[in-house]
Amino acid sequence: IIDWTDTCNAVEAGIFATIDRARREGIDLLIEGVHIRPDNQLLREWRQSGGIALGVVLHVSDQSKHEAMLKQREEFSHRSSNRYINNIKRIRSIQEEMVDRTKITGWACIDVGSENEAKRIKHYLDLEWNSIN
């Protein structure tokens, strides 16, 4: 996962620049992607400026469900699911690292392979909203 870490480091400056701009302009912001490494600095800066910030890692614990989701995604992408299926070990290693980082950072961790878990996203948003109101 070293190349994943390198890519996270490379995009980090752009992520912080996007956050700074949104704070200056007072606009809402949703940042998502596999190259956003769970990090409390991202959330802390947003909260210090009076905003609501929530870090969430979405994962799929069951590998067969994960593969099925990748195949389903192919309908909406120009990329073949084979590209992802052939790299499933690497993808799951990256996912495992992200899940491990939620334990350090306190980010929410939701298994989207489970319908009940996916419903928890609203719960986490409500908790964050209520913490400042």
Short names for language-model regions:
Residues 18-22, 46, 102:
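Hydrophobic helix-cap positions at the C-terminus of alpha-helices
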Residues 43-51, 124-128:
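Short, surface-exposed basic-aromatic patches at helix termini and helix-loop junctions that form
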Residues 51-97:
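A glycine- and Lys/Arg-enriched "phosphate-lid" helix/loop adjacent to the NTP-binding pocket
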